[in-house]
């Protein structure tokens, strides 16, 4: 809830679907304590927002006494929280992987909820790689919705059942935003995350953007524009890159700004997940850059290459229908 627009896209769809089940209470737990203004539409779909920071330091502790102490404290805290509810729906994301510091607490959450007898729904996830302990925790969930085929293959290949779907952002009700954008066409957008590229190796030559010898984007026929859908994380990094390379930068702070920017572009190059999805739904070419999240980005690349938007939306509905069906029969 820090303002990443991808979270807004997928959570809006998920919470709207959960609302259709007419629960007595629909609470949303997340961080930070004060959500970013961009998340207002998501917050409006929940009855309450519970400030719920995850213990980032846990993943940094060596196994042993320190880690065991944190695990006991976290387990007691989560048991008190989860015992107030009838089901746990884990919000979409790529955090169930051994390289993500959130994984250790998220996997513990699944185990705690399962021990309480609650249905646990992994709603539209990219999962893995995980060690055997992590896979055992994922196996305890009631249902696992894989938002791309790389995760689906990974889980099924290890004997963990999975429902193949597509990201819920494919079902977001995108609307073309009237009015001119901040950049005059023609332009091609480049979305980059600060932890995926080495800024010192970025260069522009003959209208093309490179990282070392790796071609990132070809702007020979149009202007290259740097952009981000997560201003808190990447705006500062991209501002430095933009100054060094003399490229324009647009930091989108709302879904409307993101849609307007992409709808006027000639296409998107992205190592971020949701700008590529937004481009595909709006009918713009989307090139997915591989990064440090192998299942997530490889899976998205395969989805976009092998399916029409209509097929991707059908796949996403399969996941959404599975979530609703699981909750109807389990509660």
Which functions belong to the PLM regions below?
Residues 1-331:
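Active-site anion-handling motifs in enzyme catalytic cores
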């Amino acid at each position: 809830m820090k303002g990443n627009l991808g979270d807004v896209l997928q959570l809006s769809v998920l919470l709207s679907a959960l609302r259709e089940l007419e629960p007595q209470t629909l609470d949303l737990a997340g961080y930070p304590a004060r959500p970013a203004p961009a998340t207002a539409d998501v917050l409006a779909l929940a009855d309450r927002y519970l400030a719920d920071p995850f213990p980032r330091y846990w993943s940094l502790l060596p196994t042993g006494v320190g880690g065991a102490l944190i695990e006991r404290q976290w387990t007691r805290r989560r048991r008190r929280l989860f015992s107030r509810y009838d089901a746990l729906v884990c919000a979409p994301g790529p955090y169930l992987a051994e390289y993500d510091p959130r994984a250790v607490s998220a996997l513990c959450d699944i185990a705690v909820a399962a021990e309480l007898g609650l249905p646990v729904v992994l709603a539209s996830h990219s999962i893995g790689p995980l060690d055997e302990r992590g896979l055992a925790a994922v196996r305890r969930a009631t249902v696992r919705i894989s938002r791309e085929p790389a995760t689906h293959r990974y889980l099924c290949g290890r004997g963990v059942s999975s429902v193949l779907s597509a990201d819920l952002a494919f079902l977001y009700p995108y609307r073309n935003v009237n009015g001119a954008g901040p950049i005059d066409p023609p332009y091609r957008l480049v979305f980059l995350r600060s932890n995926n590229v080495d800024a010192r190796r970025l260069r522009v030559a003959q209208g093309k953007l490179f990282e070392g010898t790796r071609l990132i984007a070809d702007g020979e026929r149009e202007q290259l524009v740097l952009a981000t859908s997560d201003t808190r994380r990447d705006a500062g990094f991209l501002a430095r890159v933009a100054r060094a390379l003399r490229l324009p930068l647009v930091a989108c702070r709302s879904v409307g700004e993101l849609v307007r920017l992409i709808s006027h572009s000639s296409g998107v190059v992205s190592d971020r997940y949701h700008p590529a999805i937004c481009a595909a739904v709006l009918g713009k070419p989307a090139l997915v850059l591989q990064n440090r999240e192998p299942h997530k980005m490889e899976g998205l690349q395969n989805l976009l290459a092998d399916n029409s938007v209509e097929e991707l939306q059908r796949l996403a509905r399969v996941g959404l229908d599975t979530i609703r069906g699981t909750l109807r029969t389990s509660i």
